[in-house]
A protein has these predicted regions:
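Phosphate- and other anionic-substrate recognition elements at nucleic-acid/protein interfaces
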Residues: 1-6, 10-143
């Protein structure tokens, strides 16, 4: 299973790659404003890495209810499935952007936000959560 983690946004789309051993690695974010260019680059990333599954962050609120961007993400998920013919797995993205941003030194955050680094780190967290659920580590032998 080769996965592409996606943190969807209207300005930037964060990406991460998951390999066969269950490790997520951030990729450069798609920051081009032109949607056609973004779709082309997304298709190139899927083809280059021979992706078999797409893992998309889904906006839930802290109380577990669906977030206000859910309809937009639902439409994006449907478009992904139609365009690439791959399964799309939705994963709770609650607090991933905050966690990704907090992993960057405070003095560097301002310039980094527009670069897409936070978005790709968030995609990495989303994907790693999926991979950890799909392939849990073996239980320790307590004998």
């Amino acid at each position: 299973m080769r996965c592409l983690g996606i943190d969807y946004g209207t300005k930037r789309v964060g990406l991460a790659h998951g390999d066969e051993i269950g490790v997520a690695t951030p990729l450069p974010a798609l920051i081009d404003a032109d949607p056609t260019v973004r779709w082309t680059k997304l298709g190139e990333a899927i083809k280059a890495r021979r992706i078999t599954d797409l893992v998309l962050g889904y906006p839930y609120n802290m109380d577990g209810s669906v977030g206000f961007k859910a309809k937009e993400v639902d439409a994006f998920a449907a478009k992904l499935k139609a365009a690439f013919g791959l399964p799309v797995h939705l994963v709770d993205e609650t607090l991933t952007s905050s966690e990704a941003e907090s992993s960057i030194a405070k003095k560097d955050r301002r310039g980094v936000r527009d670069s897409g680094l936070v978005d790709s780190r968030a995609a990495c967290l989303i994907l790693q959560d999926y991979l950890d659920q799909k392939f849990p580590p073996p239980a320790p032998n307590l004998e």
